[in-house]
Design a protein with these regions (language model features):
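Short alpha-helical segments and helix-capping/turn motifs at coil-helix boundaries
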Residues: 1-4, 64-69, 117-121, 155-156
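Condensing-enzyme catalytic core mediating Claisen C-C bond formation in acyl metabolism
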Residues: 1-52, 149-222, 226-227
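Conserved beta-ketoacyl condensing-enzyme motif
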Residues: 17, 52-111, 219-234
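Short beta-strand segments
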Residues: 18, 82-83, 132-138
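Residue-level marker for beta-strand->alpha-helix junctions and adjacent short loops that shape enzyme
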Residues: 24, 87, 139-140, 232
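A glycine- and small-aliphatic-rich helix-loop capping segment at beta-alpha/alpha-beta transitions
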Residues: 33-36, 92-102, 124-126, 147-156
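Short, well-ordered, mixed-charge alpha-helical segments that flank or form enzyme active sites
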Residues: 88-90, 140-145, 190-194
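Active-site-proximal alpha-helical scaffold in enzymes
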Residues: 107-134, 173
Length: 234
């Protein structure tokens, strides 16, 4: 059995990450990770008439870029696993409709990309696929409209309010690759911390990701593990 413990899976043959792609908005381009993004947008609408259409276009461009960088063609991709924050995952569904690839829609909020990597790796390790395209997206303006208030209302936001990323990350997973590899995954459980502050949505992730990290027998994440361990006990 490949399952290890209650939440983890060990892959018999590590799954390779063949390529990655990322497209982000102008605000993300002002941050310390700017040099690592493939494309930084200057127009948040991407020439479209709505934020939702802009996000769909963002998804399309990012996923196509990941496939292009992999050296494969869309015909070589067995499945797409992607998700976003919008109703019916329209960012993903409209974004990939022209790719003509079997699609699994995911809705895991901030965990969507990790969820896609884990499930994609399971498909490959189980010999159900050779190549899997994954993605996750969000758009600040579309998310504000979905979860808080449309920007057009001019509603005041606290300076400490969580700011949703405008961007899409994508990757191609493969059975045969040179690495890096996905060798194991740990799936989080639902932990309801009773957070009711709509301006602090990031804190909701803390309970689910914190427990697996703290219960690890070895510090796999280097400084990240140490920092998380420190704040967990404060």
């Amino acid at each position: 059995m490949k399952k290890a413990g209650a939440q983890s899976i060990h892959f018999k043959q590590p799954v390779g990450i063949l390529s990655t792609a990322s497209i982000v908005g102008s605000k993300e381009g002002e941050g310390p990770l700017a040099q690592h993004f493939d494309v930084v947008l200057s127009d948040g609408l991407l020439g479209e008439k709505s934020w939702e259409k802009a996000e769909s276009k963002l998804v399309k461009q990012a996923l196509e870029l990941a496939v292009s960088k992999s050296g494969l063609k869309t015909e070589n991709i067995d499945y797409v696993l992607s998700g976003d924050l919008l109703n019916q995952s329209i960012g993903s569904t409209f974004g990939i409709r022209e790719l003509n690839i079997p699609f699994f829609g995911l809705f895991g909020a901030c965990s969507t990309f990790g969820e896609a990597m884990g499930l994609g790796a399971m498909l490959i390790d189980g010999d159900f696929a050779n190549n899997v395209l994954i993605g996750a997206s969000s758009h600040f303006a579309a998310a504000e409209k979905q979860f808080r208030f449309p920007l057009e209302l001019g509603t005041q936001r606290p300076l400490s309010s969580t700011w949703t990323v405008t961007g899409c990350g994508s990757a191609v997973l493969t059975k045969d690759g040179q690495g890096p590899f996905i060798s194991e995954i740990t799936t989080g459980k639902i932990v309801d911390m009773g957070i009711k502050d709509m301006n602090n949505m990031g804190l909701n992730n803390y309970g689910s990701q914190n427990k697996p990290i703290l219960t690890m027998k070895r510090p796999l994440y280097g400084n990240l593990f140490i920092i998380n361990h420190y704040f967990s006990y404060q």
